A protein has these predicted regions:
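Low-complexity, compositionally biased segments
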Residues: 5-7, 33-34, 106, 116
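Phosphate-handling substructures
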Residues: 73-127
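Acidic, low-complexity terminal tails and accessory targeting/binding regions
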Residues: 1-10, 44-47, 86-98
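Active-site-proximal alpha-helix that buttresses catalytic centers in soluble enzyme cores
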Residues: 9-75, 79, 102, 126
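Short, mixed-charge, low-aromatic patches
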Residues: 1-2, 20-25, 56-58, 83-94
Length: 128
């Protein structure tokens, strides 16, 4: 490689589509993609083909589409536990509405300072 040449690595981050069960704090609950979620993922990538590899969380809502994408483009797939969603502890499986009814203002506190207002039993944001 010439001194003036620089090798560039581009990383595309794609968030999963809608999981089965609607909007809720899912964290590490392993819900698969809904039909709408599959359509969202396919629409997001279209016929884009520059990837040399696909790396994904092990959670179904990510891994199933990653497997499809890697097979479609004949590139290697790596599933990596470290890419799993942050654990939301006591909030897992709950909707924002449920949390606000039980603890008014709790989400505003969390969004203002997620380190100080971490859900009970949740993975600390600083460790995530």
């Amino acid at each position: 490689m010439d001194r003036d040449e620089k090798k560039v690595t581009t990383v595309d981050l794609i968030r999963h589509g809608e999981p089965v069960g609607g909007r809720k704090y899912r964290g590490q609950i392993d819900d698969p993609l809904s039909e709408k979620g599959w359509a969202q993922m396919r629409d997001a990538v279209g016929d884009f083909r520059p990837w040399e590899a696909v790396v994904s969380s092990t959670l179904l809502r990510c891994a199933a589409f990653a497997q499809e994408l890697a097979q479609r483009h004949a590139v290697p797939l790596t599933l990596d536990q470290r890419l799993k969603e942050i654990g939301f502890g006591a909030w897992e499986g709950r909707t924002a509405e449920e949390l606000e009814l039980e603890h008014p203002g709790i989400l505003a506190h969390f969004f203002d300072d997620p380190i100080a207002y971490c859900p009970a039993g949740a993975e600390a944001l600083a460790e995530f």
